[in-house]
């Protein structure tokens, strides 16, 4: 008889399909080597001097100039069933953008946040000319507050606090982990017309649970994210214990009937639908596609109870900011209001005021993207939205095809409802499918309680941050067993 085969964290998380596995592997020391920063930490004053000099030299050669610089540190602490770990890494970058007299924009990017590195990037754009334009930028803005420093021991203790919250752990939980992830970005934005600076400390706390339901792994999580101090907010005990209960939930065997149904989406699923829809259709980049432009020119009517905005000024929002990566001050943008599409997310390429030009890691290619999407709450408690149909829970991905508008939203489970109460039947791995505007157009209930969800993914190896605040939504759509990709 074969004995037990030891699994590494990488193999275990891979077998379970844990979505946050790469972050945990990195924090627990199982990932690849962390590249050391190419430059030491810099104080704000000397960085500003170098950047202003770069703007002055570029402004003497080009009609429009913008320089964006970032010094970013990521710290991740994790505790799992096998041990604990803390990982730290730092990334610097400077993006110099200029508009030529022909109207074409050019960029030069460097990872050297040093006087010599910035000067070399300027020469790559403007040559060796010593000419400098006169700048009237006035006094620099006040320094942003310095976040409290936490050593490895303190960070591990924060993770262990999350673990101690759970009074419902059992031997059926085959994997449990707690995570504290901090992205600290110090950002400067300077042009001939403005000088701005911000410190964005984005914090995520997460509890991850995994269990086997027959031969099928079930992975659940509780997560909270914000901008501010590590101890400003905590994961609620009830959220951590709910993640454990959901992982242990026994599913109803047998086939699931695919058909159109009334569904209630829990906040993570509602957030997933709104996030995927806004990024696929409600940006200036999407509107440049002819098929998207045609859909937006004559969209179907939407219910008056549904209002969606993107608001980076929301206090403590994980995806919030004071200015975007093109230097435009933060302001809310209404996307859905009064039963119609009311606006879109735009960057500099779209003309107008822009305001949502965002770069992955503050150094990647600029793109129009959401910051903190908010679905306005309704008047009724979420329990009042339940009637006949299904309660869909646990977001496991959403996709919207910009060309056709077709949306597919994956859910970890579907609870059958009769007379507003669960019947006890729970089906695993389903998905809601249909036209995005049809799914939004059939929203017939919006709950008053909202939940804010943080999103951190990567593009080209650089992080993208955003968040969505959403309540339960009741709508109607086609529900089927989830179709896994090969």
Task: Mark where each language-model region is.
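Active-site bordering "gate/hinge" segments
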Residues: 2-321, 328, 337-340, 419, ...
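Dual-mode signal for accessory low-complexity, basic/Gly-rich regions
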Residues: 296-486
């Amino acid at each position: 008889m074969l004995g037990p085969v030891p699994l590494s964290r990488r193999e275990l998380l891979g077998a379970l399909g844990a979505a946050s596995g790469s972050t945990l592997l990195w924090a627990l020391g199982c990932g690849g080597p962390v590249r050391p920063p190419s430059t030491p930490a810099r104080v704000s004053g000397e960085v500003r001097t170098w950047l202003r000099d770069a703007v002055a030299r570029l402004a003497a050669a080009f009609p429009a100039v913008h320089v964006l610089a970032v010094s970013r540190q990521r710290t991740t602490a994790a505790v799992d069933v096998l041990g604990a770990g803390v990982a730290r890494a730092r990334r610097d970058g400077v993006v110099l953008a200029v508009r030529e007299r022909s109207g074409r924009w050019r960029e030069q990017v460097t990872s050297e946040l040093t006087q010599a590195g910035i000067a070399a990037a300027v020469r790559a754009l403007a040559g060796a000319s010593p000419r400098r334009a006169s700048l009237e930028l006035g006094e620099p803005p006040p320094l942003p507050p310095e976040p409290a420093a936490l050593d490895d021991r303190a960070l591990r203790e924060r993770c262990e606090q999350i673990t101690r919250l759970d009074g419902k752990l059992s031997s059926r939980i085959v994997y449990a982990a707690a995570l504290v992830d901090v992205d600290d970005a110090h950002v400067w934005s300077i042009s001939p017309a403005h000088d701005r600076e911000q410190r964005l400390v984005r914090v995520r706390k997460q509890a991850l649970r995994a269990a086997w339901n027959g031969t099928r792994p079930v992975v659940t999580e509780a997560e909270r994210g914000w901008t501010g101090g590590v101890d400003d907010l905590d994961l609620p005990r009830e959220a951590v214990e709910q993640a454990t209960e959901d992982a242990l939930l026994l599913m109803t065997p047998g086939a699931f009937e695919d058909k159109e149904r009334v569904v209630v989406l829990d906040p993570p699923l509602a957030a997933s639908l709104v996030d995927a829809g806004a990024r696929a259709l409600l940006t200036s980049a999407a509107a440049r596609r002819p098929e998207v432009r045609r859909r937006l020119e004559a969209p179907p009517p939407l219910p008056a109870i549904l209002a969606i905005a993107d608001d980076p000024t929301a206090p403590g929002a994980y995806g919030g900011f004071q200015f975007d990566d093109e230097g435009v001050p933060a302001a809310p943008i209404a996307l859905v209001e009064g039963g119609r599409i009311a606006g879109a997310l735009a960057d500099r390429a779209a003309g107008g005021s822009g305001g949502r030009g965002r770069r992955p890691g503050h150094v990647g290619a600029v793109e129009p993207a959401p910051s903190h999407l908010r679905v306005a709450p309704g008047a009724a408690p979420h329990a009042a939205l339940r009637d006949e149909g299904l309660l869909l829970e646990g977001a496991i991905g959403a996709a919207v095809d910009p060309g056709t508008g077709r949306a597919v939203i994956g859910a970890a489970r579907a609870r059958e409802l009769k007379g507003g109460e669960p019947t006890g039947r729970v089906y695993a791995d389903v998905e809601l499918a249909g036209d995005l505007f049809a799914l939004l157009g059939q929203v017939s209930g919006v709950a008053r309680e909202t939940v804010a969800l943080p999103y951190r993914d990567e593009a080209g190896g650089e992080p993208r941050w955003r968040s969505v605040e959403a309540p339960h939504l009741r709508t109607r759509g086609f529900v089927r067993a989830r179709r896994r990709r090969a």
